[in-house]
């Protein structure tokens, strides 16, 4: 019963589970077992070394020397180089031809430009306009003489006689002015009452006080240095 239950987990050889033979696990006897890659690599190396030895022997042999001499005489190298160069130039020529064909195809796709038709310009002559007629006024005859008359201004004496006597007026404007009636002519002299009073300096009523000298060292210092200027504050209204 236990073998049946664990047979699914056991390694298999094909379709048969391996329940007892555990020694064969991981060997080439199993399906998909180990593979010796080292042997394959060593075989490849041995085959390569053998090919190299065979080639060197053939190259250094008398037959190889004769073959090389024959190749030099027939100029095989030059022919190979010429063939390669001609092939390269031919490939370049083919590429240039293909590019030219592509350019021509793209140019053919565009619609051809229509030639510009020059428009015939017809010069239209402007109709001759009728000349303008301007009527000029008739000129006066030269025999006529112009006579200009002008009234001469009156003389100064006549003007003074016709003028009214100069009388002082009450208003500056002539329409508002009225004559001032007085026995004596007015003058610009000021009245005695209008004259300003004579200037008289005001005498100060402040008593003059002499500085009081203190006794002791303060008085001695005042005698040496002096009391200086007296400062008097006065308030005046202008």
Swiss-Prot record:
Motif position, Nuclear localization signal: 233-236
Motif (PPXY motif): 153-156
Post-translational modification: Ubiquitinated by Nedd4 following partial capsid disassembly; which might play a role in intracellular virus movement during entry.
Pfam families to which the protein is assigned, alphabetical: MCPVI
Propeptide residue interval(s): 1-33
Presence of keyword Phosphoprotein: yes
Residue numbers spanned by region Involved in endosomal membrane lysis: 36-53
Region (Binds to importin alpha/beta, involved in hexon nuclear import), start-end ranges: 228-238
Name of the molecule in the record: Pre-protein VI
Annotated site (Cleavage): 33-34, 227-228
Family: Belongs to the adenoviridae protein VI family.
Keyword rRNA processing: no
Stretch list, region Amphipathic alpha-helix essential for membrane lytic activity: 34-54
Region (Disordered): 187-212
Upregulation: Expressed in the late phase of the viral replicative cycle.
Positions of region (Interaction with hexon protein): 48-74, 221-227
A GO CC annotation given for this chain: host cell cytoplasm
Lineage: Viruses, Varidnaviria, Bamfordvirae, Preplasmiviricota, Tectiliviricetes
GO aspect biological process, one term: microtubule-dependent intracellular transport of viral material towards nucleus
Extra information: All late proteins expressed from the major late promoter are produced by alternative splicing and alternative polyadenylation of the same gene giving rise to non-overlapping ORFs. A leader sequence is present in the N-terminus of all these mRNAs and is recognized by the viral shutoff protein to provide expression although conventional translation via ribosome scanning from the cap has been shut off in the host cell.
Domain description: N-terminal amphipathic alpha-helix domain is essential for the membrane lytic activity.
Alphabetically ordered keywords of this record: Capsid protein, Cytoplasmic inwards viral transport, Disulfide bond, Host cytoplasm, Host nucleus, Host-virus interaction, Late protein, Microtubular inwards viral transport, Phosphoprotein, Ubl conjugation, Viral capsid assembly, Viral penetration into host cytoplasm, Viral penetration via lysis of host organellar membrane, Viral release from host cell, Virion, Virus entry into host cell
Native species: Canine adenovirus serotype 1 (strain CLL)
Motif Nuclear export signal: chain residues: 67-76, 219-230
């Amino acid at each position: 019963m236990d073998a049946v239950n664990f047979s699914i987990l056991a390694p298999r050889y094909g379709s048969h589970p391996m329940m007892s033979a555990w020694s064969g696990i991981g060997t080439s006897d199993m399906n998909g077992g180990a593979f010796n890659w080292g042997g394959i690599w060593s075989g490849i190396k041995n085959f390569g070394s053998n090919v190299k030895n065979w080639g060197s022997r053939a190259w250094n042999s008398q037959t190889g020397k004769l073959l090389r001499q024959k190749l030099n005489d027939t100029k095989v190298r030059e022919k190979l180089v010429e063939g390669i160069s001609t092939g390269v130039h031919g490939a370049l020529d083919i590429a240039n031809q293909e590019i030219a064909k592509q350019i021509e195809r793209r140019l053919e796709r565009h619609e051809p430009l229509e030639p510009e038709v020059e428009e015939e310009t017809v010069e239209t002559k402007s109709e001759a306009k009728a000349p303008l007629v301007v009527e000029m006024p008739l000129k006066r005859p030269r025999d006529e003489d112009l006579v200009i008359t002008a009234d001469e201004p009156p003389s100064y004496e006549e003007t003074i006689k016709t003028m009214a006597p100069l009388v002082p007026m009450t208003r500056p404007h002539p329409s508002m002015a009225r004559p001032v009636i007085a026995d004596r002519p007015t003058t610009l002299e000021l009245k005695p009452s209008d004259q300003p009073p004579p200037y008289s300096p005001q005498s100060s009523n402040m008593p003059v006080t002499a500085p009081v000298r203190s006794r002791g060292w303060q008085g001695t210092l005042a005698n040496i240095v002096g009391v200086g200027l007296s400062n008097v504050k006065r308030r005046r209204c202008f």
